């Protein structure tokens, strides 16, 4: 039988359960928090579905809306979900292209957690009659996860007509 988490394991978690969180409207990666993965010997996916992502077009300043899917195979650290929510909210006034936002998010999460594998997929609502759905991924170099990343990238979105994201 496994035990729940001990208080000393949770001492770095400051946002979850805190009713006085400040919502930053400008890009704030330092809000991200982690906790230890208690199942380090096992490969498993953690997936976040984030349907309320907003950023700004760097040219027009108009808002862009997306659902973001973040999936990763943790190593030692895992991202805490409320800190991720506040982090994603901090893109609200961030002016960047869709592709840049997805790569920034992935890079920040790699720097934070050092996962075995991670992928970030943004499904943006159409503007000007065109939707943009950037997908980016990473697998730890010189490991089976690097090969996995290459395989998933090459096979990503093979049947886009089956994807209903609007």
From Swiss-Prot:
Gene Ontology CC: one annotated term: cytoplasm
Transferase as UniProt keyword: no
Keyword Oxidoreductase: yes
Location of the protein in the cell: Cytoplasm
GO terms for biological process, alphabetical: queuosine biosynthetic process; tRNA modification
Keywords of the record: Cytoplasm, NADP, Oxidoreductase, Queuosine biosynthesis
Active site: 57, 64
GO molecular function, one term: preQ1 synthase activity
Pathway field: tRNA modification; tRNA-queuosine biosynthesis
Amino-acid positions noted as binding substrate in the UniProt annotation, renumbered to this chain: 79-81, 98-99
Enzyme Commission code(s) on record: 1.7.1.13
Known catalytic reactions: 7-aminomethyl-7-carbaguanine + 2 NADP(+) = 7-cyano-7-deazaguanine + 2 NADPH + 3 H(+)
Top-level taxon of origin: Bacteria
PANTHER family attached to this UniProt entry: NADPH-DEPENDENT 7-CYANO-7-DEAZAGUANINE REDUCTASE (PTHR34354:SF1)
NCBIfam families: QueF-II
Function: Catalyzes the NADPH-dependent reduction of 7-cyano-7-deazaguanine (preQ0) to 7-aminomethyl-7-deazaguanine (preQ1).
Family: Belongs to the GTP cyclohydrolase I family. QueF type 1 subfamily.
Stated name of the protein: NADPH-dependent 7-cyano-7-deazaguanine reductase
Organism: Staphylococcus haemolyticus (strain JCSC1435)
Gene behind the chain: queF
């Amino acid at each position: 039988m496994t035990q729940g988490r001990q208080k000393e394991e949770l001492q770095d978690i400051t946002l979850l359960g805190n009713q006085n969180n400040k919502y930053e409207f400008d890009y704030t990666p330092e809000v991200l928090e982690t906790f230890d993965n208690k199942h380090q010997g096992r490969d498993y996916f953690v997936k976040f579905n984030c349907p309320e992502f907003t950023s700004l077009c760097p040219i027009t300043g108009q808002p862009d809306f997306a659902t973001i899917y973040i999936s990763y195979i943790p190593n030692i650290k895992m991202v805490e979900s409320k800190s991720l929510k506040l982090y994603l909210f901090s893109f609200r006034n961030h002016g960047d292209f869709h592709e840049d936002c997805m790569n920034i998010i992935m890079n920040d999460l790699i720097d934070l957690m050092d996962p075995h594998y991670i992928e970030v997929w943004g499904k943006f609502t159409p503007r000007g009659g065109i939707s943009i759905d950037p997908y980016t991924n990473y697998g730890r170099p010189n490991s089976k996860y690097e090969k996995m990343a290459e395989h998933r990238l090459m096979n990503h979105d093979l049947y886009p007509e089956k994807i209903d994201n609007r």
